Structure formats: C-alpha cells, structure tokens
Curated annotation (Swiss-Prot):
<dbReference type="InterPro" id="IPR020936">
    <property type="entry name" value="TrhO"/>
</dbReference>
<dbReference type="GO" id="GO:0006400">
    <property type="term" value="P:tRNA modification"/>
</dbReference>
<dbReference type="Pfam" id="PF17773">
    <property type="entry name" value="UPF0176_N"/>
</dbReference>
<dbReference type="GO" id="GO:0016705">
    <property type="term" value="F:oxidoreductase activity, acting on paired donors, with incorporation or reduction of molecular oxygen"/>
</dbReference>
<feature type="active site" description="Cysteine persulfide intermediate">
    <location>
        <position position="185"/>
    </location>
</feature>
<comment type="function">
    <text>Catalyzes oxygen-dependent 5-hydroxyuridine (ho5U) modification at position 34 in tRNAs.</text>
</comment>
<dbReference type="InterPro" id="IPR001763">
    <property type="entry name" value="Rhodanese-like_dom"/>
</dbReference>
<comment type="similarity">
    <text>Belongs to the TrhO family.</text>
</comment>
<keyword id="KW-0819">tRNA processing</keyword>
<protein>
    <recommendedName>
        <fullName>tRNA uridine(34) hydroxylase</fullName>
        <ecNumber>1.14.-.-</ecNumber>
    </recommendedName>
</protein>
<feature type="domain" description="Rhodanese">
    <location>
        <begin position="127"/>
        <end position="225"/>
    </location>
</feature>
<dbReference type="InterPro" id="IPR040503">
    <property type="entry name" value="TRHO_N"/>
</dbReference>
<dbReference type="Pfam" id="PF00581">
    <property type="entry name" value="Rhodanese"/>
</dbReference>
<keyword id="KW-0560">Oxidoreductase</keyword>
<dbReference type="InterPro" id="IPR036873">
    <property type="entry name" value="Rhodanese-like_dom_sf"/>
</dbReference>
Length: 313
C-alpha cells in the first residue's frame, strides 16, 4: 500500500444469511449511510447483503457496526482498502432477488461451498498440474488481469457461468479427467455460488480463494505472486494492483468496460460517449444522449469546483 495518507476507507463486503424482510432493513441503513456521508452501493435480498461502500473512518465505523448488527451478519466477510478520495458519487441501497445474480434458484451457499484456500496457500494449489483453474468473472474483467494459467469462460454475465461449467465438465469427463477445480473472483462472493453450484453438480474436489483476488493482492508479495495484470473493481478506481494500489485503467462511461492507453488512443474513443469495445453496440441516438450527459456532468463539476474555490478564499 502507499505510504501517503489516504483518508478514505473502502469496505467490500458480503454475507449470505436469511433476511425475512429485506425491505424493512433498507430505510434505516440508507438513512445512516447518508447521515454519515457514506457513498457506494449495497444490495439486500432474502439471501443476504453484498456491496462496496466508502467514507471517513468514523462514519464507516458506525455504518459497519450497523451492518454487523443485522440478522446473522456478525461474522460477515469484508475487505478494507484506502483511497485519497471517495470512489463513488452517491449512495444506493437496492433490493434484489439475489445479492449476486447466477439465476440458479436452488443454489444456496449456506448449504455448502467449496474448500477455502488462504492467499498464502493459493500458489501451491494452482501450480499443481492436476488442478484446473477457473476465473469466474466476466470477460471484460479477465481481459485486464488474471492468474497465470487460468481458464477464461468468456462470459458476459454470471448467469452464463452454469452453462459454461456444465460444458467444460463434460469435456473433461470425455477425456477421462477428474481434476481438482480451483475458482476465484474479485472478492469471493461469486465463488460462494460457483463452488456451491459445482458441488450440486457432483464435483467433490472444488476449492476457492478466500477473500478473492483483492485479499491475494493485499497479502502476497508481488515478487511471489502468480497474478498477471490488474484487477478490475466496480468503483471509480477502475482497477487495482499489488498492495491494492490504484491501477492504470480508466473506464468507458458508456459501457463501463475498463480502458487502457491504447483504447483511449483509438479514433472510436470519445470521452463519456464510446470506446473501441462499445462503439458498434450503440446507436447514434444513444451516443448523442451520452454526449449530453457528459456535458452536464462537466458543468456540474465546474460548479462544484467554483463553489469550493469561493469557500477557500
């Protein structure tokens, strides 16, 4: 991590626990977040809570105490990092059917998941030639970084993962292989469902990285790491590197995909409007709408900067 003081605390969290009435939890949680100046997004569903929030240490302490006091959440999984400024612009608490959408209603991680592997033990597992390593994230996330030797399912959404996994398993069985399966994702939540799904499909020897990529990058020294590239994150940092340092990628405000310097040098890149990944996916009307949104946001930022300048005189 950076030696420079970074005043903002960022917490990525999730927990599978039964909420009888998620809607009743939403109001008090949102009210407290707004009172404490917390920004980010939290998802509530009958199966639990998931999200990433950021704010001052004092505000985050109070909000995290509230979250841990929710039914069954005393031991929720969370990962801390720091930033020089808020990586979110607003606070949202949304009600969902699932806190991570897989589209397999019978899968319940509370009934069993794969075997957790600590970051410091991960290298040994994935270096074993009898281990199949699977990245459970979407294609645009995998594109900017993954573990050496990992299989990329090339999914556009997590809903596509079950079908891909069934096909891949059939391919392995046709070759007479029954390898160990190791899965990983950004913070661990997708692997709670993907390994639970694998077990429901009859796979016994399935493992997943405890704390996800973020915990690995925080824990394992870069010189010992088998991670290649950067890790996409769903906030204004866009990507992080070893030690959870902010990465080098920007994001396309039209499609939310990460962009490197080559992408931004493309003639198809227009700030806030299009990029090489989405230019052919958008209509002229959509691009016009994005351009207007970008203009309005620039005006709003200029007004905020001017207001701050007056206050500092």
């Amino acid at each position: 991590m950076s030696d420079t003081f970074e005043p903002i605390r960022i917490v990525a969290l999730y927990h599978f626990t039964p909420f009888e009435d998620p809607a009743a939890l939403r109001g008090p949680l949102l009210e407290l977040c707004e009172k404490e100046g917390i920004k980010g997004i939290l998802l509530l569903a009958r199966e639990g809570i998931n999200g990433t929030i950021a704010g001052t240490d004092e505000g985050m302490e109070r909000v995290m105490a509230h979250i841990r006091a929710l039914p069954g959440c005393a031991d929720l999984e969370s990962k801390d990092s720091r930033a020089p400024e808020l990586p979110f612009r607003r606070m949202k608490v949304r009600l969902k059917k699932e806190i991570v959408t897989m589209g397999e209603p019978d899968i319940d991680p509370r009934q069993g998941v794969g075997r957790y592997v600590a970051p410091e033990d991960w290298n040994a597992l994935i270096s074993d030639p009898d281990t199949i390593l699977i990245d459970t994230r979407n294609d645009y996330e995998v594109a900017i970084g993954t573990f050496k030797g990992a299989e990329d399912p090339k999914t556009k959404s997590f809903r596509e993962f079950p079908e891909w996994f069934r096909r891949r398993r059939q391919e392995l069985e046709a070759k007479g292989r029954l390898p160990k399966i190791a899965m990983f994702c950004t913070g661990g939540i997708r692997c709670e469902k993907s390994t639970s799904f694998a077990r429901a499909e009859g796979v016994d020897e399935v493992y997943h990285l405890k704390g996800g990529i973020l915990k690995y990058l925080e824990t394992v020294p870069e010189e010992e790491s088998l991670w290649e590239g950067e890790c996409f994150v769903f906030d204004q940092r866009v990507s992080v590197k070893h030690g959870l340092e902010i990465g080098t990628h920007d994001v396309c405000h039209a499609c939310r995909r990460p962009l490197n310097e080559k992408d931004k040098a493309s003639p198809l890149f227009v700030q806030g409007v299009s990029c090489p990944h989405c230019h052919n996916e958008r209509t002229e009307e959509q691009r016009h709408r994005y351009a207007e949104r970008e203009r309005q946001e620039a005006l709003a930022q200029a007004r905020r900067a001017g207001h701050l300048g007056v206050r500092q005189k």
